């Protein structure tokens, strides 16, 4: 009842804030879809006048390791073949580039090879690459304040926000995608986004101190980019990447309205799969395309390398996600990816010379872990995370505290077969059982939700964990406070 009441008042408040046009858009379209480019006004970035040659075909194309070798058991439904897997996973495209050869390409669920599809937050990564190019050209600096480009940001609350903060989601602006559904809806369906971002002056944290994934940050970033370059995001993309790379398909970029003409740089690009693969290949070669350095090499290396300066979230840099398994001491690959709503992915593994593209109409499991398994399987290596987690589970036990002071207790138990499971107890929660997930995370299924505890490991010691209950990487962090005493352990067990 409490949740229903909260949602009612939240939506009521949203409706009061929205203009009639924005309200009607939300009412008409509701949740975003991969075909949204058909619904909204859009600008076209034309295909290259001279498209680059098709990818080199691998010697044994369209052959991947059996699903059982790299797809976790939780994700498999019996002995599925590939066609069944594509259908059940709601995938529309799956492409694998290895050693610069097209190893695998498949389309499903009504999607055609050259058909565009909205890539949502991969748009953020594309926008960031353009900012990297502008930095290399001296048109903008990562250390430059946003107020140099948007005068409204000169107010006391926002004047400390810099380009770097927007690139790395540490701006401190009071906007968080998974928390503020109302604000995100207003941003997505607003008919004048430039006006919206200029007037959005709520700040909750000092810039550079807190990571929070927010689409608003990239839209602000795109406004700065356009002022710095004197071009729209779409025109700059055409000049700097689309034409030089010989892209096969037009790129589409939705705009808020024909009157305002603001391009949705945070999530409005619609691209064909093969051009996504070319972007992945560009990233694989650190911004170099057939001998021409299109994106500064150091901008890409900032994503790949784990050289932190204390300001960026460990799993996110320059609008790309980093696998994070390296930080947890599990795998040593320096892989990274761009991702978008409904499971759009550009996955890049420089150590294995691999790019994977996945597009779909639904994200029903954690692809970011699947891609690394596929990469290892292609190289004939074990994909069982338990092989890389020796003596890992015993360190889970302890008392953990979040930044807001909330504490939880976690203890390990064994079932009759000797398999580990854990007992979780929070301040407002009944004691719950959690089962291990692939040796890396533990979680519990409750109806259609799953809590995931993704551990942060330094050397042989557990430092804490991130709590993720939405299958996305925006996580509440709990730091290990102390071990659990024998007395505390008995008290917790007595609640059973």
Label every model-predicted segment.
Residues 118, 136-174, 202, 227-266, ...:
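Active-site helix/loop module of the DD-peptidase/beta-lactamase fold
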Residues 22-28, 338-390:
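Structured C-terminal helix/loop/strand segments within mature extracytoplasmic catalytic/sensor domains
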Residues 20-25, 383-496:
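Peripheral terminal and inter-domain segments
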Residues 248-254, 304-355, 432, 437:
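Active-site Gly/Thr loop motif
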Residues 217-224, 265-289, 344-361:
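Active-site-proximal alpha-helical segments within enzyme catalytic domains
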Residues 100, 117-142, 166, 221-225, ...:
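Active-site SXXK
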Residues 85-95, 106-139, 143-152, 157-159, ...:
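Short active-site loop at a secondary-structure junction
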Residues 3-7, 16-111, 137-139, 382-384, ...:
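N-terminal leader/targeting segments and the immediately adjacent pre-domain N-terminus
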């Amino acid at each position: 009842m409490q949740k229903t009441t909260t949602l009612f008042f939240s939506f009521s408040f949203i409706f009061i804030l929205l203009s009639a046009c924005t309200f009607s858009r939300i009412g008409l379209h509701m949740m975003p879809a991969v075909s949204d480019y058909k619904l909204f006004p859009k600008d076209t970035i034309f295909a290259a006048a001279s498209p680059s040659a098709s990818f080199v075909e691998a010697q044994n194309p369209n052959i991947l390791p059996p699903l059982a070798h790299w797809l976790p058991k939780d994700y498999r439904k019996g002995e599925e073949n590939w066609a069944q897997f594509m259908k059940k996973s709601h995938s529309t495209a799956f492409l694998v580039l290895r050693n610069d050869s097209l190893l695998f390409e498949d389309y499903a669920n009504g999607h055609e090879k050259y058909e565009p599809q909205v890539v949502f937050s991969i748009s953020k990564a594309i926008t960031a690459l353009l900012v990297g190019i502008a930095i290399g050209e001296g048109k903008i600096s990562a250390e430059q304040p946003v107020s140099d480009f948007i005068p409204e940001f000169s107010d006391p609350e926002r004047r400390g926000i810099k380009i770097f903060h927007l690139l790395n989601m540490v701006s401190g602006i009071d906007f968080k995608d998974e928390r503020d559904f109302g604000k995100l809806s207003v941003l997505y369906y607003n008919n004048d986004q430039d006006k919206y971002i200029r007037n959005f002056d709520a700040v909750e944290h000092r810039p550079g101190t807190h990571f929070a994934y927010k689409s608003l940050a990239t839209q602000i970033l795109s406004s700065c980019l356009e002022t710095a370059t004197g071009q729209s995001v779409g025109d700059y993309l055409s000049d700097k990447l689309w034409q030089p790379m010989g892209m096969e398909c037009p790129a589409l970029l939705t705009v808020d309205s024909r009157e305002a003409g603001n391009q949705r740089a945070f999530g409005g690009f619609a691209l064909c799969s093969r051009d996504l693969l070319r972007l992945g290949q560009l990233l694989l070669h650190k911004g170099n395309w057939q001998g021409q350095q299109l994106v500064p090499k150091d901008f890409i290396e900032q994503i790949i390398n784990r050289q932190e300066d204390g300001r960026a979230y460990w799993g996110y840099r320059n609008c790309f996600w980093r696998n994070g398994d390296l930080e947890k001491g599990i795998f040593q690959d320096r892989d990274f990816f761009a991702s978008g709503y409904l499971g759009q992915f550009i996955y890049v593994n420089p150590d294995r010379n691999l790019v994977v593209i996945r597009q779909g109409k639904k994200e029903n499991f954690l692809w970011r872990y699947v891609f690394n398994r596929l990469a290892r399987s292609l190289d004939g290596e074990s994909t069982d995370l338990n092989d890389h987690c020796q003596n890992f589970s015993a360190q889970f036990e302890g008392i953990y505290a979040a930044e807001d002071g909330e504490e939880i207790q976690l203890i390990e138990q064994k079932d009759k077969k000797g398999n580990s499971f854990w007992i979780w107890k929070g301040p407002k929660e009944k004691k719950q059982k959690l089962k291990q997930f692939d040796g890396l995370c533990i979680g519990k299924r409750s109806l259609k939700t799953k809590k995931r505890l993704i551990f942060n490991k330094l050397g042989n010691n557990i430092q804490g964990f991130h709590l993720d209950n939405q299958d996305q990487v925006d996580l509440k962090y709990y730091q290990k406070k102390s071990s659990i005493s024998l007395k505390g352990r008995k008290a917790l067990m007595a609640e059973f």
